[in-house]
Design a protein with these regions (language model features):
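Membrane-interfacial helical/loop segments at transmembrane boundaries in membrane proteins
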Residues: 59-67, 183-187, 394-409, 479-498
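Interfacial loop-to-helix junctions that mark the boundaries of transmembrane helices
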Residues: 2-6, 69-78, 129, 185-193, ...
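Hydrophobic transmembrane alpha-helices and their helix-loop junctions in integral membrane proteins
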Residues: 91-101, 106-131, 140-454
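Hydrophobic alpha-helical transmembrane segments
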Residues: 72-86, 194-206, 409-425, 496-514
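Aromatic-capped, Gly/Pro-kinked transmembrane alpha-helices
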Residues: 480-505, 521-608
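Alpha-helical transmembrane segments and their helix-start/interface "positive-inside/aromatic belt" motifs
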Residues: 28-41, 153-160, 286, 290, ...
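Transmembrane helix-loop-helix hairpins at membrane boundaries of multipass inner-membrane proteins
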Residues: 1-12, 16-110, 178-189, 486, ...
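Hydrophobic alpha-helical membrane-insertion segments
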Residues: 37-51, 161-170, 373-385, 462-479, ...
Length: 608
């Protein structure tokens, strides 16, 4: 089957399974099985399609989206986004089958698979207007998946603001070029400088969807109250479509100005640092992971910002390094954040708690989930040999290249960005230690944690599968990075002083070194050892006498107190009249439902 056929079949499977899941929604396990199996098959097709594009000599594939009559194009860049969506949605779909067996869980197959279908269409359509419509359908589905009226209300309000900005850009572009087809726009603007006033509203609108700080208000609330599969899709699919839109408007209509790339770099650095800092303060594991998603969105923006800066300055080496680093980290983030959200969901499934202060000792109760979560957390902290390390290392190289260029702004920003990213990495390592230590080590703090059992086998399989993807993405990085580089048709001399097999061996050896040192330096064991209760100054030892998440983060909280207060000082919600009204959530959800229905009918009728 051709690449275009695979994409068409994937969208069809998503849509058909969504409809069938809705039909059988009253029988929740059956609805979940239909949505999960259909979503898994469609996601596997996207992975095959994306991989085929990267491996084929012919990198550009064009055609029509079946039943919708929308022109689509699958090139190297589109293929990377298809991989990011498919690799995340595959374990999420499998996980969702068992998730529907929990008595407190509502059937979500219609919204989840409709979201995935819209996201797939969004990253392959060739018309900027179609991109906005598909992104809107996806965002509305996500708003209903938040599981909380307050967070859904905030997402709907901010999302409509972003949609208005995107629509404004569409109107400006139509008025200027007479078309919304990206290929025709770029043909008219070949070798010309971009008019940023046309595209800036769209950039802000897509940045809001991507959760770039300070446009991130919806993200932590939406993740905290949503189901684990939905929260995973928010981070790995919805926000990635926002990044796709940001990159699209950055490159459309000619060569972007230098300040555009610098703006993306600044936005990425602010988002990465603030997201990592706020994550360390959280105890709700899904809210914590949401802030870490913001951190990684910032890191991806740093890579894409370096790429756009290279385009503006016609520096091919900076272009390639920024593109490889940003895009590889985009895929890697989808993998390890899927691992973490699904792992957190498996823990909730057995304990009913998302607050890590109420857990502890889960590692002994759920060993495979614990191991997979450790892999995901190490990848999140960019520790070798996991996949998070590879993408960030290439982004560091782009900063080093920037600091040796001819432009003063590059020589100024390169070292500053490298130091900022290093500090952000240190915060991520602290967060890794906090989450794993407080949740999976130590003694259980509640009866639910003490009585926890292993998760259902399909849940465990999904989490372990995502963790294996993280490991493969790190060890195989020397061979995968050239494929990512080939997705963008610019060649540059970017060489390495170490061979690819040697890099892979070093990545494998890094985590083994501590164990080798332990074996080498260990002394003789005592012939007889006695065991007793821990000494706590004469008091009886209690399970609560362990390191808490609050105590672990307290030094950083005191050091950065002014920055942490910003989210309270700069909260725009308090300024909106009627926002706290009890009737506001129901009213906004009603409007969202009508808008979603109208958009779906319009898209279907256009295809008919």
């Amino acid at each position: 089957m051709s690449v275009m056929g695979l994409v068409n079949q994937a969208v069809t499977w998503y849509a058909a399974s969504a409809v069938l899941a809705f039909v059988f929604a009253m029988h929740k396990p059956l609805s979940g099985a239909i949505a999960g199996i259909g979503g898994a098959v469609a996601s596997a097709m996207l992975v095959v399609a994306g991989g085929a594009v990267l491996l084929m000599p012919e990198r550009i594939h064009g055609g029509m989206l079946q039943f919708l009559h929308l022109t689509m194009r699958v090139g190297g860049v589109n293929a990377l986004w298809l991989l990011a969506i498919g690799l995340s949605a595959l374990p999420v779909s499998l996980f969702n089958i068992s998730w529907h067996r929990h008595p407190q869980v509502k059937a979500n197959g219609l919204l989840v698979n409709l979201l995935l279908a819209a996201a797939t269409c969004a990253v392959v359509v060739t018309n900027i207007g179609s991109l906005v419509v598909m992104a809107e359908i996806m965002a509305l589905c996500a708003a209903f998946l938040t599981g909380c009226a307050a967070s859904g209300k905030l997402w709907f309000a901010l999302g409509r603001l972003g949609t208005l900005l995107m629509a404004w850009t569409c109107w400006l572009v139509w008025s200027t070029y007479g078309t919304l087809e990206l290929a025709q726009i770029n043909l008219q603007a070949v070798d010309m400088m971009q008019n940023p006033l046309l595209w800036l509203p769209g950039l802000v609108g897509f940045a809001l969807l991507a959760g770039a700080i300070p446009l991130h208000g919806w993200a932590p609330q939406a993740h905290a109250g949503a189901s684990a599969p939905a929260a995973a899709l928010f981070s790995t699919v919805v926000m990635k479509v926002g990044l796709y839109g940001m990159l699209t408007v950055s490159l459309a209509g000619g060569v972007p100005p230098l300040w555009w790339g610098v703006m993306l770099l600044a936005l990425g650095m602010i988002t990465a640092f603030i997201g990592g800092l706020y994550a360390l303060m959280e105890h709700n594991i899904q809210r914590l992971l949401a802030y870490h998603t913001l951190e990684n969105i910032g890191i991806i923006l740093l890579g894409l910002g370096a790429f756009v800066t290279g385009v503006a300055t016609r520096n091919s080496t900076l272009m390639v390094l920024g593109f490889i680093g940003g895009m590889y980290h985009l895929i890697n983030h989808s993998l390890f954040k899927t691992t973490l959200f699904l792992g957190a969901g498996a823990v909730w499934f057995r304990t009913g708690h998302r607050d890590i202060e109420k857990l502890g000792g889960i590692g002994k109760k759920m060993p495979l989930i614990s191991l997979a979560m450790l892999v995901g957390l190490m990848a999140m902290a960019a520790l070798p040999p996991l996949n998070g390390f590879a993408g960030e290392w290439v982004i560091y190289q782009s900063f080093f290249k920037m600091s040796t260029g001819d432009l003063f702004i590059g020589r100024l920003l390169g070292p500053l960005l490298a130091v900022g990213l290093a500090i952000t990495g240190a915060l991520a390592v602290m967060c890794m230690a906090k989450v794993y230590g407080v949740t999976f080590l130590g003694a259980p703090r509640t009866k639910e944690a003490e009585n926890a059992t292993c998760a259902p086998w399909l849940m465990t399989l999904s989490v372990v599968l995502a963790a294996v993807f993280c490991l493969v993405g790190g060890i195989a990085a020397p061979w995968l990075l050239p494929l990512v580089s080939g997705a963008f048709p610019v060649q540059a001399q970017v060489s390495s002083v170490v061979s690819q097999p040697m890099i892979a061996l070093l990545l494998i050896a890094c985590p083994l070194l501590p164990f080798l040192l332990m074996i080498f330096f260990k002394g003789d064991r005592l012939a007889a050892r006695s065991r007793g209760a821990a000494w706590v100054c004469g008091y009886d030892h209690e399970q609560s006498m362990v390191v808490t998440a609050h105590g672990f983060a307290m030094p950083v909280k005191e050091a950065f107190a002014p920055l942490l207060k910003l989210r309270h000082w700069l909260n725009p919600v308090r300024l909106v009249p009627g926002w706290q009204s009890a009737s506001a959530p129901a009213l906004l959800r009603g409007i969202a439902l009508v808008e979603l229905a109208v958009l779906v009918v319009i898209v279907i009728s256009r295809g008919a």
